[in-house]
């Protein structure tokens, strides 16, 4: 499992380069997804990997670890993620969000036993998740076409190009010991996937086309993220066409 996660960054960049070259371009009804044929192939590949390796591991993770332990793990990674969110809040000139996120980090690190407890939320310090893709969007960079990345899942061309910097800004990747980085990466994958077990099953059972459901949901969420929950009534995806809110 560790080996494919170590290769995920290069695979993601490869997908972005293929998109830039217009690989597998097809005419579709949705202007946001001009590479749907390629994206569906990658989506199916990700489904196979998930069903064979990631989902069973996440189910075992839930079975073995008590709920309070899993909550602590999620809080720990959330605290690490707040550091990069704080940086991007600053890059977006969001002064209050930057200060409050800094306060969250200090409160949870020192009063929450290294982030295992989310004391800051109890103190009503709002958690804001920001990344470099959102920062680019804040400064007017269009999302570009929808892209499904190998192993990493839904993205846009803008977010794919922002991915290397997001990875460099990930505090868990700053540990000098490679074994520690690998353990943290694997644990975070299990933490994220375990939290989606029921959601993914419901989507697959209820949707006639899970690919379309995931795509539309992801793009809507990213649009809301960029505009802090208040997106415009229409949105230009950089191809000359606008999509209604």
Please report, for each region that a protein language model flagged, where it lies by residue:
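Bacterial N-terminal signal peptides that target proteins for export
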Residues: 1-12
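C-terminal motif of bacterial Sec signal peptides marking the signal peptidase cleavage site
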Residues: 19-22
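A structured, mid-to-C-terminal "fold-capping" secondary-structure block
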Residues: 25-27, 134, 139-245
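Post-signal peptide N-terminal segment of mature Sec-exported envelope proteins
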Residues: 30-60
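N-terminal post-signal-peptidase region of extra-cytosolic proteins
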Residues: 42, 62-73, 89-93, 100, ...
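N-terminal, post-signal-peptide region of Sec/Tat-exported proteins
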Residues: 51-79
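Surface-exposed patches in mature extracellular/periplasmic domains of secreted proteins
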Residues: 69-72, 92-99, 121-122, 225-232
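Mid-length scaffold segments of soluble, non-membrane domains
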Residues: 79-157
């Amino acid at each position: 499992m560790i080996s494919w996660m170590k290769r995920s960054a290069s695979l993601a960049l490869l997908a972005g380069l293929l998109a830039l070259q217009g690989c597998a371009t097809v005419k579709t009804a949705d202007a946001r997804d001009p590479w749907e044929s390629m994206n569906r192939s990658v989506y199916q590949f990700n489904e196979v990997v998930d069903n064979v390796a990631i989902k069973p591991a996440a189910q075992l993770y839930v079975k073995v670890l008590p709920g309070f332990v899993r909550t602590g793990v999620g809080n720990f990674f959330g605290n690490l993620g707040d550091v990069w969110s704080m940086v991007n809040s600053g890059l977006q000139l969001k002064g209050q969000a930057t200060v409050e996120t800094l306060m969250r980090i200090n409160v949870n690190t020192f009063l929450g036993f290294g982030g295992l407890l989310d004391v800051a939320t109890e103190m009503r310090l709002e958690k804001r998740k920001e990344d470099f893709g959102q920062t680019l969007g804040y400064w007017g960079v269009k999302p570009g076409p929808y892209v499904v990345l190998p192993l990493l899942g839904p993205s846009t061309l803008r977010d794919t190009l922002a991915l290397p910097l997001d990875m460099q800004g990930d505090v868990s990747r700053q540990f000098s010991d490679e074994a520690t980085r690998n353990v943290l990466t694997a644990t975070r994958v299990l933490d994220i996937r375990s939290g989606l077990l029921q959601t993914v099953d419901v989507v697959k059972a209820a949707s006639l086309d899970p690919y379309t459901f995931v795509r539309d949901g992801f793009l809507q969420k990213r649009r809301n993220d960029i505009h802090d929950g208040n997106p415009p009534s229409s949105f230009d995806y950089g191809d000359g066409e606008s999509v209604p809110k």
